[in-house]
């Protein structure tokens, strides 16, 4: 249902005094949403083959590009399998996070988030890139340093190593209620790209710092904005309220 909604929704607004119609550019296949829909916590207990079944069902009802939440990607061998299967299914990109398996949801309170060593994660990226057939399929690294309470320098060092490993883009994650730290990262990320003579997209997920606009994020240097799990969150609340009236 989310795939159908994202595929067909069109919102009319104004831009520079002119009426414009806007649509979603792509679909985010969320691990949290997929797990919750099956009654499981978001801790990588849902098997990849089960996730793949959901992915194929969504792709059957949409022609939008799909970005898949790949959790940690497992070990390098498992990630090769993931990349191969997702590419064959028609997925456009996979995002994997640099936590150790099994991961815990980044917004879960009171949980210690353990990160994988950047050298190990970089090797996983290399293995994934080596197995893909098409140059169009993207592997994006999700940096969890700020989620884990690490300093900005840790996030930037990880970004540098992952870019040198051949990753196609970087996602910086934060659970802060204001966007200051991700904007700081974005500015310093551009310096890294210039030093490496690269052009790689930057991704964010403004779930907690949701007052900032797309235009402001774009001006800060972000290329992709993911609105994660919003349809599930609103559907859950609506179903709870309806259930109370039955």
Label every model-predicted segment:
Residues 230-246:
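Extended, intrinsically disordered, low-complexity segments
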């Amino acid at each position: 249902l989310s795939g159908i909604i994202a595929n067909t929704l069109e919102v009319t607004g104004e831009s520079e005094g002119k009426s414009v119609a806007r649509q979603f550019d792509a679909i985010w296949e969320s691990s949290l949403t997929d797990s919750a829909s099956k009654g499981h916590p978001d801790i990588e207990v849902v098997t990849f083959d089960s996730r793949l079944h959901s992915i194929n069902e969504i792709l059957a009802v949409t022609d939008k590009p799909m970005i898949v939440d790949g959790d940690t990607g497992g070990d390098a061998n498992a990630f090769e399998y993931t990349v191969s299967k997702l590419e064959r299914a028609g997925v456009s990109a996979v995002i994997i996070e640099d936590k150790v398996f099994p991961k815990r949801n980044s917004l879960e309170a009171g949980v210690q988030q353990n990160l994988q060593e950047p050298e190990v994660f970089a090797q996983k990226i290399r293995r994934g890139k080596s197995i893909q057939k098409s140059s169009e399929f993207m592997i994006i690294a999700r940096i969890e340093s700020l989620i884990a309470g690490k300093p900005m320098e840790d996030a930037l060092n990880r970004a540098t190593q992952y870019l040198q490993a051949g990753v196609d883009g970087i996602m910086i994650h934060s659970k802060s209620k204001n966007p200051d730290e991700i904007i700081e990262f974005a500015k310093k990320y551009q310096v890294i790209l210039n030093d490496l003579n690269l052009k790689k997209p930057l991704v964010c997920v403004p779930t907690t710092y949701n007052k900032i606009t797309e235009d402001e994020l774009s001006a800060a240097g972000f290329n992709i904005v993911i609105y994660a799990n919003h349809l599930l969150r609103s559907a859950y609340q609506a179903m709870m309220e309806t259930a109370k009236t039955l």
